[in-house]
Amino acid sequence: GVGGPGAMAEKMTFLSQLSSHLEKVRNKRRGYILCGGWELMAHHADAEDAGNSSSLPGLSASERGWLLDLFSSGYSDAFSEGDPELGAYTWWPDGDDAGGLRTDTHIISEILLERVRRAYIYDEKALSRHAPVVIDYDLTL
C-alpha cells in the first residue's frame, strides 16, 4: 500500500472494523450500494502493469484478501457485473495514462446484482487522477 507499514496497519484495522459493520448491514437483507475510491483491487487484472504487484497500492495479499472475503460474504463488485471486460482503469497514481489501476467501484449487496444494467468509466475528460465509475441500476426509489 501507499504510506508505508504504519499506514497499511491503520488501513487494515479500519477494514476489519468495516467488515464487522458490513456484516450487520448484510443481515438486514436490504440492498446497499457503497461507492468510493477504495484503493483496493481484487484481481491482478485490475492493474494495467501488475508485474510487481506487491508494491501496488491496493494489491497486497492482505488488501486483496479482505476484498475477496467481502465478495464471498454477500457483497459484489457492481462494475464487474455491468462491464466484465478487463482493461478498465479508474486511477493513475502518476497522473498520466500509464500504470492505471481499477481501485474505484460500487460494492453492492448481492440482491442488487440483477439490478445492474450497465457500467462504464467516464474518461472523456480528466477531472482528476481518478475517473468516475458510472453504474446504471434498475431501481425504484
Regions found by a protein language model. Give the residues of each.
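Active-site regions of metal-assisted phosphoester/phosphodiester hydrolases
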Residues: G1-L141
